[in-house]
Swiss-Prot record:
The lineage of its organism: Bacteria, Pseudomonadati, Pseudomonadota, Alphaproteobacteria, Hyphomicrobiales. Its cofactor is Mg(2+). It catalyses: dUTP + H2O = dUMP + diphosphate + H(+). Its EC number is 3.6.1.23. Keywords: Hydrolase, Magnesium, Metal-binding, Nucleotide metabolism. It comes from Beijerinckia indica subsp. indica (strain ATCC 9039 / DSM 1715 / NCIMB 8712). The gene is dut. One of its GO terms (molecular function) is magnesium ion binding. One of its GO terms (biological process) is dUMP biosynthetic process. Residues 150-160 have a biased composition (Gly residues). The keyword ATP-binding does not apply. InterPro entries: dUTPase, dUTPase-like, dUTPase-like_sf, dUTPase_trimeric. This is Deoxyuridine 5'-triphosphate nucleotidohydrolase. Belongs to the dUTPase family. Residues 139-149 have a biased composition (Basic and acidic residues).
Length: 160
C-alpha cells in the first residue's frame, strides 16, 4: 500500500506596495522544485548590472515560512548559462522566523552588461524541511575510512 505524498507546507505571502501588479512567486512547471522570484523594480526603471557588478534586488514579497522549514534563494540556470548572472550568496537562506522582504543579491560574472526590468525573473526559491541540531562537545570523534581528508581528497577525474 503506497502512502499519499505529504501535504506541502502553506506559506503566507505579504505583498508590499512596490509589488502591486506582479505575479506571486510561482512554480513554472508541475515538476519544478523552485518558485520563480521576479525583480520588483519601479515601473519604467532599467537596472544595468555591469560585468563584475552586484546589486540587491527587491522582490516585493515577505513570507511566513512554517516552523521546521526554510527557503533557499538559488540562481536560475538560464541566467547563469546565457549571461553569467548568478546569486552571489547562493544559496541565500530564508529562516522561518524572518519576516522581512525577500531580497536577491545578483552578480554579473559575464562579459556584457545585463539589463533587469520590473518583472524579470531573477532567482528561484526552494522550500525544504530543516532541523536544528544539538551540538555536544567532545574530545574524540569516531574513526572513518576518510578521516580528516577534505577538499578534493576523494579523487579526481572520471570513474572508469
Amino acid at each position: 500500500m503506497t502512502m499519499p505524498p505529504p501535504r506541502p507546507p502553506r506559506i503566507l505571502v505579504k505583498r508590499l506596495a512596490h509589488a502591486e501588479g506582479l505575479a506571486l512567486p510561482a512554480y513554472q512547471t508541475a515538476g519544478a522544485a523552485g518558485l520563480d522570484l521576479a525583480a520588483a523594480l519601479p515601473h519604467g526603471t532599467t537596472l544595468v548590472l555591469e560585468p563584475g557588478g552586484r546589486h540587491l534586488l527587491p522582490t516585493g514579497f515577505c513570507l511566513e515560512i512554517p516552523e521546521g522549514y526554510e527557503a533557499q534563494v538559488r540562481p536560475r540556470s538560464g541566467l547563469a548559462r546565457k549571461h553569467g548572472v548568478t546569486v552571489l550568496n547562493t544559496p541565500g537562506t530564508i529562516d522561518a522566523d524572518y519576516r522581512g522582504e525577500i531580497g536577491v543579491i545578483l552578480i554579473n560574472m559575464g562579459d556584457e552588461p545585463f539589463e533587469i526590468v520590473r518583472g524579470t525573473r531573477i532567482a528561484q526559491l526552494v522550500v525544504a524541511p530543516c532541523v536544528q541540531a544539538e551540538l555536544i562537545e567532545t574530545h574524540t570523534l569516531s574513526d572513518t575510512e576518510r578521516g580528516e581528508d577534505g577538499f578534493g581528497s576523494t579523487g579526481h577525474g572520471s570513474h572508469q
